[in-house]
Amino acid sequence: MLRLVGCFGKFNKVGFCFFVMAMKEVLKSELELISVSDEEVSRLEGVALDFIKSLKKRGLTAYIGGSLAKGTLIVKEKQDIDIFVVFDYSEDILKLEKILKKMKLPGELKLVHGSRDYFHVDCGDVVLEVVPVVENKDPELAENVTDVSLSHVRYVKGEVLKNPKIADEIKFAKAFCRANRCYGAEGYIRGFSGYSLEILVIYFGGFEKFLKGIRKKNVIDPMKYFKSDREIMRELNANKLQGPLVVVDPTYKFRNVCAGLGLLTFEKFLEVSEKFLKSPSLDFFKRREVDVKGMKEFALKKKAKFLELEFRTDRQEGDIAGTKMNKFFRFFVKELAKNEQGVLRVEFDYSGVGKKAKGYLVVLEKNEVEVCGPSIGLEEQAVKFCEGKGNAVFKKKGFWWWRKRVSVDRVLEFVKGFEKEMGAMVREVKSGK
């Protein structure tokens, strides 16, 4: 039970004190739940170092990376440890697979396709992510984003060394975003990467400050490389400015570490963080599954259509499969909007395993939309338009218009024609089936 020690006086002061105590108690309890024990950290480091020693015997240099190296690891059912294998030249990377196949590994080896292929060594409750990187002293000359990963580790470790308490604050941010489906730079999630959360929490000075501050600032330059937000927007590649948030990489000023963050994911994050700040609870750190029942009830209340879709693909499970299916789902959502179907709620659900995913929507369906045709003064085009559209045409504001019959089902049938191009298939899951 929470006690308000010394919080007497006006009601609003008492309320504020209660909030502060509640937040502290929640975070204290959550830290106990997500902190990896010293013994477990030692065990994980042992697994990683044994593997690195095996690589060294074969002439390869490797380092521990990721959350384990930075001291920001949180409890998970299956831990993943980044192992960066450093090469002098990109051509040398090709020999890594041959070496790994000849080694006696602590688990099953799996090739994972990405911007640069890497490897998983599945050891049961631990997965070693073996990532080849090319050593470089100038991030601007890096051939691949993974080549600057070691500089990310050095930056975060340096900040944690200056302020050891910030490591726990970063853990809160990772656990919170993971629970609320906002964590992961994978294409099917389009959430915060672990590194972006580390930068943001360090910049704002804590987890709670991050949740509050991110609502007020969407262009962030931690190292103050640029004189103004306008200069940032001018200097960074336009392709890196499409998302809702611009965060300049402290290790390379021309990179936006939040370039992959999706608008829908960010909006959901803002919504849930606002609720948490108003009423702190451990429930916000529990994995949020898609509330199908709630979506159905919402659809009923709004007199809208609830839609459940199943996606399949033949692409490699994980990021590639998930991204293909998510891209197809987002294409369908865009086509619904083009046809003036009111998309009220959207959820995509892929576990990261397998080649199936689900999409859920609540849509306020329209049966008819008005489509503008040629100007009344353009006689030849107008005649062709009227002949082609029949009795559905009418005049309005100097143009011919056409009443087009539309529906969610028609849009779904239309997008099915793109299955081969999208690399995924879709079908509607009917209620009770």
Task: Please tell me what each predicted stretch does.
Residues 97-141, 336, 344-357:
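Conserved catalytic core of two-metal-ion nucleotidyltransferases
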Residues 90-97, 209-212, 369-371:
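Short, conserved charged micro-motifs
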Residues 165-348:
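Conserved nucleotidyltransferase catalytic core and NTase-mimicking acidic/glycine-rich helix/loop elements
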Residues 126-180, 205:
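Internal, well-ordered alpha/beta segment that forms a basic, Gly-enriched binding/recognition surface
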Residues 15-76, 92-94, 119, 133-139, ...:
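N-terminal regions immediately upstream of nucleotidyltransferase
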Residues 347-433:
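Extended, charged low-complexity segments
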